[in-house]
Amino acid sequence: GRVRKGRPAADAATSVVGVAGAPVRQGRGAEMAAVHQVLATLGYGDAIGHEVLGIQRVLRAAGHDSEIFVQTADPRLEHLTRDYRDLIDVSSPDNVLIHHFSIGSRASRVAYALPDKMVLVYHNITPPEFFVDVHPLLVQLCFMGRRELGAYRDRCVLALGDSAFNTEELVAAGFPRTGVLPVVPSFSHLANTAVGTIAESFDDGWTNILFVGRMIPNKKIDDLIRIFHAYKTQCNPRARLLLVGSYGGFDLYFAMLQQLVATLKVPDVFFLGHVSNEELSAFYDVADLFLCASEHEGFCVPLMEAFHKRVPVLAYAATAVPSTMDGGGVLYETKSPTHVAAVMEAILDDADLVEQILASQDAALDRLAAQDFDGTLLRFVDEALAAPPGIAPKVSFDFWDQFELQEQLEEVRQYRPSALRALPVRSTFADAASTEASATADRSAHESPRGARE
């Protein structure tokens, strides 16, 4: 457990998204169009929450009126938000509305029906197959969310992904005008380290393997446990696995993970749950390696946090992970536990190699911090403002009810095609019933005794 210091304060400052004091653009006059944001939930300490607040700081510094409208918010952030229904009162065809898309929220549906020029920001939706047999409701919500995304294809003046990977999904979904609004995370929440935490008890000379993220199926925590088991039994018995992140809502998956630990009889696996920012910083400080086996990420901020805290990263090369790491750290392409354990041993037993990895991560982090988030955002806002005034889409009172019925029909088509093949092709249900009644009568006539027919 070698304690590491984070990057210099000056570097950290340049990486804060939406730095206050961004230059105000000239030549717009006293009245500037409002640029509001709408999303389902503003969470405390999560990547989307940081991005939303950063966007607001940039917009306000540039002279725009900018509010955050939500359905729900963490109690610690409620004072920074307004109820999504208030958006109706401030809506205008000349305004820009930045819509952070999420699955099936009422806030999203209100935003859809307003005349504001919409800029959709897509943070990705996990493919539903990851949650089969673990969270049936989430399977349905993710399936519907990915389908609902298509309803906004012609509603937006721009559709932005917060990574190149997410933008590629927008292009594949048929959005005609797309771009990348890069995530430039703030690391200010890691500036202070708690004293007297459980993390300090792990700073004892053992090798600490760390993962930070929710305990959910697409993060493949089960693969992390299998890899750690191979490393501990074959390479280093004085090692422990620290799993930091909430498992709320995924009790069944969490129980499966605990059962896996018991089945493998692997000791020193610690499920640490959700922790404070100060405790999180302490866990990064005692970590010797950040290990990631996730198979679906839209960006993955904890990878950048590990870079910032100078913890060498070994991650599975899937979805947005390679582009997020941008040449820093080490990627692996096979999930063989013995293979990954050997790579872990090669890294941790070679101090010079660790320094080379940390240098590659520092360079990647510098490239990330050098991205002009403020300028990129304001250019996209100007592009949206230059679009013709918005027109409220013609939405019937039962539009979303009909959309949900179509979703259900599409789900049947994909997963129970035989049910659709059983429906009449050219006739209505009434015609089909009439035809069936006639056929029944004919069969009865043919099957009756000769005397009755005569």
Regions found by a protein language model. Name each.
Residues 312-315:
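Short hydrophobic beta-strand element within catalytic cores of glycosyltransferases
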Residues 330-337, 346-351:
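Conserved acidic donor-binding segment of nucleotide-sugar-dependent glycosyltransferases
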Residues 153-196:
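Donor nucleotide-sugar binding/catalytic pocket of nucleotide-sugar-dependent glycosyltransferases
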Residues 71-74, 238-255:
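Glycosyltransferase donor-sugar binding loop
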Residues 275, 282-287:
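Short alpha-helical donor nucleotide-sugar binding micro-motif in glycosyltransferases
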Residues 254-278:
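Nucleotide-activated donor-binding/catalytic signature segment of Leloir-type glycosyltransferases, i.e.
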Residues 295:
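Aromatic "clamp/platform" in nucleotide-sugar-dependent glycosyltransferases that forms part
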Residues 160, 199-219, 224-228, 242:
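Conserved donor-binding/catalytic core segment of Leloir-type glycosyltransferases
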